[in-house]
Amino acid sequence: TDTVNAVFCTHPDSDHIGGLPSLLRNYRVDTVMTNGQTGDTETSRLFEQLAQEKAKTRLTVAEGTEILFPTTAKLSFLYPLTTIPADSPIETNEGSLVAKLDFFDTSFLFTGDLPHEEEAIANIEPVDILKVAHHGSRFSTSDEFLDLLKPKEAVVSVGENSYGHPHPDVLMNLK
């Protein structure tokens, strides 16, 4: 099929939205969800333009937003507490969307680049699979956060980089 039902962008940094302009150009996208904040890069501007032109629906989401899918799936947004104005001075990582996907009997937590300071999310509960925050940076995915989540599996999304991601301490804590 050439249709994508839904896409959510955790925050407008290029390493999180870099592939979305191509997706929007090449597929029909029903719904694009963001936290409301826009970035100041060419990639971010292109994403915003294409999302406006191509997506059937644009949603600005925050804690409490739930999307129900007909295949017994539910996407629940847990953070940020409120939507973020497009031109907000809030550092983009601090406003990263955090979403829990319940799909049949499996739960996934997507954390964007959420830093340690923002990990005190209300109503957080254990999950089966964790998408590790900020590419495994030492400034995200604290021991306390892992103790709360108790993930059975963890996924680190990272490519070649000069930051040393994933950090060895984070990898050790995931074992």
PLM features per residue range, with description:
Residues T1-K175:
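Non-globular, low-confidence helical/coil segments that flank catalytic cores
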